[in-house]
Design a protein with these regions (language model features):
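NAD(P)+-binding Rossmann beta1-loop-alpha1 motif at the extreme N-terminus of oxidoreductases
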Residues: 1-47, 51
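Short, well-ordered alpha-helices that flank and scaffold nucleotide-derived cofactor binding pockets
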Residues: 17, 21, 86-90, 113, ...
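A structural signal for isolated positions on well-ordered beta-strands in alpha/beta enzyme cores
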Residues: 4, 27, 97-99, 121, ...
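Rossmann-like NAD(P)(H) cofactor-binding subdomain of soluble oxidoreductases
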Residues: 52-137
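Generic preference for hydrophobic
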Residues: 28, 59-60, 148, 259
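Single conserved hydrophobic/aromatic residue that forms the stacking wall/gate
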Residues: 248-267
Length: 267
């Protein structure tokens, strides 16, 4: 399949790299130092599941150089959503699917308003990953999960084709029939973790290991969970308790927001 990583940050680079290693034609939208490193040295992934070096990758700052693709992995930060969606237009063909792998609960609607609902698939990504430098992606968690599906639960042949391709590339991809529930579950988890990370300056393993911060973290999730229930989102009643025991709470897991907070404090 022809696939574009919009853009070549940690999430786009990881999934794009795994798909390219499996033989798919992947384009990486990048800029500045990251772009130059990708062009010169290729993409390097350092992962607990095995390192990967792709010495030759197609990286460009201009989606017009890519043209229509089968799948766009849309993984920019939320504040860049509208700008990135506009830039994505040259990569949209009649059967293109754009999978939104962003945090939050409204990226699907925002991207759909620009590219059209027929092209956009809501998704979530569970992965602890950062750029370790230009052209270098660091994956530090045992998990690297992609979840996606039509918001109304309907089948999509192009998405099904991508799911099979991702599975063949050893990507843990999990199709969902209720993506509204899935994106809210991710939001409840991540917004709470980001808040407690930034307040305490502690990774989640340390938060869970101290009774007061553990209780505070749980309370944050319960408040977000209550909002989801008021909105009619079908999150399971015991979801917060299950999340507190989840293996996704690896000892050094922290939100990207916490990394930003730390960098600002160091300046």
């Amino acid at each position: 399949m022809r696939i574009a990583a919009m853009a070549a940050g940690a999430v786009g680079s990881y999934f794009g790299g795994r798909l390219q290693a499996a033989g798919h034609d992947v384009a990486y939208i990048a800029r500045r130092a990251n772009l130059e490193a990708l062009k010169k040295d290729g993409l390097k992934i350092q992962s607990v599941h095995g390192d990967l070096h792709l010495p030759k990758v197609f990286a460009t700052p201009d989606p017009k150089e890519v043209g229509p693709v089968d799948i766009v992995l849309f993984a920019v930060k939320l504040w860049d959503t509208e700008t990135a969606a506009e830039l994505t237009k040259p990569m949209i063909g009649p059967n293109t699917r754009v999978i939104t792998l962003q945090n939050g609960v409204d990226s699907y609607e925002r991207v759909s308003a620009i590219l059209g609902k027929q092209h956009v698939i809501p998704g979530t990504a569970y992965i602890a990953a950062v750029l370790g430098g230009p052209g270098v992606m660091l994956h530090t968690s045992k998990f690297a999960i992609m979840r996606c599906g039509r918001l109304d639960g309907s089948k999509d042949a192009q998405l099904d084709k991508f799911v099979e391709a991702a599975k063949a590339a050893n990507i843990d991809i999990q199709p969902q029939d209720d993506m509204n529930r899935e994106r809210w579950q991710k939001f409840i988890f991540l917004s709470s973790m980001a808040g407690v990370n930034c307040l305490t300056r502690m990774e989640i393993g340390k938060v869970l290991g101290e009774p007061h911060t553990r209780a505070f973290y749980k309370k944050l999730m319960e408040e977000s969970f209550a909002i989801s229930q008021k909105l009619g989102v079908k999150v399971a009643p015991n979801w917060v308790e299950d999340r507190m025991r989840s293996e996704e709470h690896t000892s050094e897991l922290q939100s990207h927001l916490n990394l930003v907070c730390r960098l600002l404090l160091e300046k």
